[in-house]
């Protein structure tokens, strides 16, 4: 464990910091520009995987896959919470565009009404004529969405538009024994720039 005190920050380390990010509608800023495919029900997981693999093979562009192992049959508050989490993932500023996969048309219609601030397409598996047809429809949608985000460019953004998730422990044998001076020094810089942060302490 380290017993060396962290050096005080110089003003040059915290003055006028910026980064190159993707500005989204509503003012949020992303540091990534992911094309994502989101399966809202486990029945769609394999279709999401195969459609993503086909797009990656055709374009050499990565697709962020977001899937769950159990998503169907939840009721009331449980279903609302699950849908809220999925929606917040789609709205994350690091996602530039998203394809949402549902099982039935009714669910697809509900999801289609939710997103207006970024390119999002919703596809119901029941709209396809079997798995192969649905994979083809999903691949076509990914291509359209990919074309949308290829035109996005990074622009200078103030450091204060970032939100950081921090973990102070779990990285070495000294976790929960002593503090992490690197995290502490970073937080000092972040606070000086009015950055939001969420810390997960391990101990």
Task: Kindly give the residue locations of the regions a language model identified.
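Metallocofactor- and cofactor-centric catalytic cores in central/energy metabolism, strongly enriched
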Residues: 1-167, 171-203
